[in-house]
Amino acid sequence: MKKQSFTFNLCAASAIVLATSSGQAAAQTPRANGETLGIQNYASTTGNMHAIIAKEKGFCEKYNFKCEIKILNSTSLGLQALVGKTIDITQSGADLVGAAVAAGAEVVIVGTSLPANVLSISVRNDVPVPSRDKGYPGIMNDFKGKRIGVSARGSSSEKHFNAMLKDAGLKPEDVTYVAVGAPSTTYTALAIGKQIDAAIMYQPLTQICQFNKTCETVIDMTIGEGPKSLEATIGANIVFAARKEMVESNPKLMEAFYAAMTDAAAWFHDPKNFDELVKIYTPIISFGDMAGADEMRRNWIKSVIPAYSKDLKVKVSALQEIMDFSLENKIIDVKVEAKRVLWDKAPQTP
């Protein structure tokens, strides 16, 4: 009887432990309340890969909220929509989020999407670049008097180009900016319509130029070319931002958002999912009837995956570098501390 009693007690104790552990796990699993989050994405690029995959693979639903993807092709347009409450999460350049905060907008950075700079400068083949061998910033003198394509007027791409002109002793007035939208329409304006001479743009403009041999990238900031100060900003360049009142009043939703986005990151960083990732992006990134489009798309997506954050952590020192850069280049007119722009509950590292 004693042996039977001991066995029974051991089984009962094990059952209690298992039940308790299961209950704790369930309690710890983030769960929203069925809300819908409008999240910014960009056309014709890999854009907001976290949100696209979270939606397509059911990670949003897993944590009981819906992801609604909305196309807005610049940080400035995304921030306008965020403040106007037509979207809830932007994928934005941290510099313009800081500018919005300095101007009085009640928005905060809630995570990092792409830690490093995503911009590059490409020129059409028939545009002379005599200072190329001088490197940066000397090469910037070749853009004086030229028409420069940017995603939208007032966007992060324009602000960065202004700062690069300054490094060469030039002014914004020394070039003419033209809003050209996404990489695909930028390519048309650059290489086919010739409405612009050069463009500062995110990928895949670099890849399209390389493939068609009609234009080339002369400064690629994604691989460390350009201003040396950019190295110190790695960790906070392209960020997720939201309205402060929204994140403060919806802690469960934000926990669910983080869980869904990090699940998405784990999924698209896993090599075994690459073919499915390409399949998801094929209708999003269309190269039309361009020969070799499938190969170019695969190679580009494969090359860009490592650029995306796995944990959404914001590097605070990098964010401060961006705020200081913004002040120095008159993107903002007052000093802004990183902690003022960053939500205190956002995943972060010093």
What residues fall within each predicted segment?
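Extracytoplasmic/secreted envelope proteins and their assembly/folding machinery
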Residues: 48, 52, 79, 94-97, ...
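Short, solvent-exposed loop/beta-turn-alpha elements that line the ligand-binding surface or hinge
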Residues: 62, 128-134, 223-233, 305-314
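C-terminal segment of classical bacterial N-terminal signal peptides
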Residues: 17-25
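Bacterial N-terminal signal peptides that target proteins for export
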Residues: 1-11
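Conserved C-terminal helix/tail region of periplasmic/extracytoplasmic solute-binding proteins
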Residues: 319-350
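Secondary-structure end/capping motifs
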Residues: 247-331
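Pocket-lining segment of extracytoplasmic ligand-binding domains
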Residues: 185-283
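Short, glycine-/small- and polar/acidic-enriched structural segments
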Residues: 28-180, 195-203, 220-221
